């Protein structure tokens, strides 16, 4: 029986053009650039003027071009998201429609910030079964839709964006080698949007607002523990040590979490790719966006061992060990882009900020 692997052959990203800076946030929140940067490492984040599926589609087109294949070669699409355009149907089908793919398995996956790592393992296992040849694995979020813009603790953290990879079937021992995923369900309430879904009062007058529960200190402790144990598991299972890792792609939630994860794992912080300062926490999109930029900037080289680690609501956690193939250059480039945005981030958020503040004042 042939042993198949799923090589990452293409990579792409999509960041909306409207930038919301820390100084912008200080115009309507009791905060400052210094307060946010020192506690989170974040300086800017992006605010989308389009739907989550639009972000996902642009990232997917970039990944396809860099893989040197067409959309018609794709037979599996997995979109990791907790902020879809619609509940029914899934947005993977919208991405499929946008790419004009006639027939492919397409579904969404919600594991919050760990979603891309879950999706990467799921896609890899399906390709290894021999049933699929090329897969699009996408992490895409429009978290600005959920944010209570009167609540400082969460308003400063999140941003919008998408990242994507193409997985291609191969007999070479590259791609995801080992993975460990799990969920600490006892802590599911400390990071949640609890009233979105059938648990909310559908006919409530204030049905345009949802609480965003966020217990920062407890999340920090559980994030480091979850990602750390998962990372240790995949390294041990692969018979590798921390010194064998060339690059770490961690979930971009908080610079302190990234630093603590590296310190507790004994991995040099210089190996961790960090771009949280530019985009904030884009949930399921952080890992693929960071992976894409790490390749673009030359941090990932042929044959590198890459450690992925993420943590999210649920409380989900996961890690994966990826063996990069021999190609780090794009075969082609895509000119795919979002439609132009004629508003600033503050202008895009104006109505949401006013309504959130009005509710807080009641």
Curated annotation (Swiss-Prot):
GO terms for molecular function: 3-oxoacyl-[acyl-carrier-protein] synthase activity; beta-ketoacyl-acyl-carrier-protein synthase III activity. GO terms for biological process: fatty acid biosynthetic process. Its EC number is 2.3.1.180. It catalyses: malonyl-[ACP] + acetyl-CoA + H(+) = 3-oxobutanoyl-[ACP] + CO2 + CoA. Homodimer. Belongs to the thiolase-like superfamily. FabH family. This is Beta-ketoacyl-[acyl-carrier-protein] synthase III 2. The lineage of its organism: Bacteria, Pseudomonadati, Pseudomonadota, Gammaproteobacteria, Vibrionales.
